[in-house]
Amino acid sequence: MDEALMPREKLLKYGAAALTDAELLAIFLRTGIKDCPVMQLSKNVLQHFGSLRGLISADQKQFCAMKGIGITQFIQLQACTEMTRRYLLAELKEGYCFSSSDVVKMYLQTELENTEREIFLVLFLDNQHRLIKQERLFLGTINKAMVYPREVIKEALACNAAAIILAHNHPSGVAEPSFSDRQITEAIKQAAELVEIRVLDHFVIGKGDYFSFAEQNLL
């Protein structure tokens, strides 16, 4: 690979996946500032925030405090993030069959990992494990969401779901499930079994991490 290529030319020749985080960010930023070319600015920004994830997760005040980037770049990045979220949701909606959890995990992380309050979300699936709809059923405080199994089952029956996937975030950033997380998962599973609905998984979303009950054989 020709290391002398500028990021945009490198992308056109080899594809976006061949670029480093700094090169991708340089394309996004487009220009540098006085005495700091765009590639150096990109590296400075990544060093300041720790990673692309750290940059994307930054709030407006944190983002704009970094020399060389400001409100325009913040708005553009928020728009890009939202477009990515909608793209992933569209991928799920368009007859997506849940034979692999990779797209699901990516979507759930985009949807939940940067929220300040705990959100309990449910994906409702048909008998071929295709998405019928998703619902944010419960919104909690900074560290707790009140989840009622009967409401989950009520929604599942209303849309004739054959299976469900549960997900919630931990605003603390730690993806390890709590004792109450395990309790509510078991309660929903037992309630679902009474009406022949399968609980396929329960994802706990943290900062850059997740926990899958199914992957850990807890369902």
Feature-to-residue mapping (PLM):
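Long, highly charged, low-complexity intrinsically disordered interaction regions
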Residues: M1-F63
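C-terminal extensions
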Residues: A16-A17, D21-T31, D35-Q40, Y87-E135
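Short acidic/polar active-site loop segments enriched in Thr and Asp
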Residues: A17, A162, R198
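Conserved hydrophobic/aromatic pocket- or pore-lining residues that grip, position, or stack substrates
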Residues: H129, L166, D201
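Divalent-metal-activated hydrolytic enzyme cores
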Residues: L139, E186-L219
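Short HxH-centered metal-ligating active-site micro-motif
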Residues: L139-P177
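Alpha-helix N-cap and loop-to-helix initiation/capping positions
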Residues: E176-I184
